[in-house]
Amino acid sequence: MNKGVSLDNCVPKFFKVYLPDESGDDMVLPISFTRFLPKSLPETVTVRSISGNIWKLELKKCCGDDDTEKFVMVNGWKRIVKDEDLKGGDFLEFEFDGSSCFHFCIYEHRTMCKKIRRSSDQSEEIKVESDSDEQNQASDDVLSLDEDDDDSDYNCGEDNDSDDYADEAAVEKDDNDADDEDVDNVADDVPVEDDDYVEAFDSRDHAKADDDDEDERQYLDDRENPSFTLILNPKKKSQLLIPARVIKDYDLHFPESITLVDPLVKKFGTLEKQIKIQTNGSVFVKGFGSIIRRNKVKTTDKMIFEIKKTGDNNLVQTIKIHIISG
């Protein structure tokens, strides 16, 4: 890849032109950029694209053929290429926050226009290739994991999780436009019950429900946080409807997007998902099917949703999902 470094506005940046024939499994940082890396080198870095995708990559120090010290992002560059559907000649800009996060954007080769983040009403831009039926499907801000992530060419250690990545690819590649269309096609003025999308685990008598609620709170990070428990409705598993009673009881408010934290966060990171608020007050988390698929949730499992809010206005920033096998 062609590359360079910019000091505009004192923000460390570097640029690359994506050349498929020269692009390897990992991404080498420009040698001139290494002086901007912190002295205490992080083991992992976050790459966050303007399209909303987030990846966790390992950062390794290696030596080239001429013994020149190099730094390389390993175990994930091929996923970024796939998730962002990079084309030959696309111009990539990486901006470093000085700690452990790289923000990057893409300028398309043909138009030199920057790809921007989609709104909830725009069509999907991110394409992933289906390995099973060779169809292209649009992705919904999901970490689409590449089963071809081989070991590093830089002798920086083996990837012991390659089989896990392959499994995740098969699970997550079909998180597509259907997730959003199901939500958008619900009329705003039609009342929606809590079990229309993900079935609420409310089929219990009240005495037993109180006992179960107390037992389930043991799984929360903070027992005082709002929470609700759901089981999977196999017919409606592509989006999540926040129960109206929870919103009302805790006077919750929602931004345009929230962070989802699931049991696989240490391996694959968090997921950023869009919020759909209808005129009748119904609140959906769009693209929730990715959580169902990558955790292989069964209809016998319980999903305990812990809502983490900030400030006096009870703004929801994060929902943590605890999955109890049934």
Swiss-Prot record:
Identification of the protein by name: B3 domain-containing protein At5g60130
SMART domains reported for this sequence: B3
Any single Gene Ontology cellular-component annotation: nucleus
GO MF annotation: an example: DNA binding
Organism: Arabidopsis thaliana (Mouse-ear cress)
The organism's taxonomic lineage, starting at the top: Eukaryota, Viridiplantae, Streptophyta, Embryophyta, Tracheophyta
Database matches in InterPro entries: B3_DNA-bd (IPR003340), DNA-bd_pseudobarrel_sf (IPR015300), Plant_B3_domain (IPR050655)
Chain ranges passing through the membrane: none
Gene3D superfamilies, A to Z: DNA-binding pseudobarrel domain
Annotated spans, Disordered: 124-222
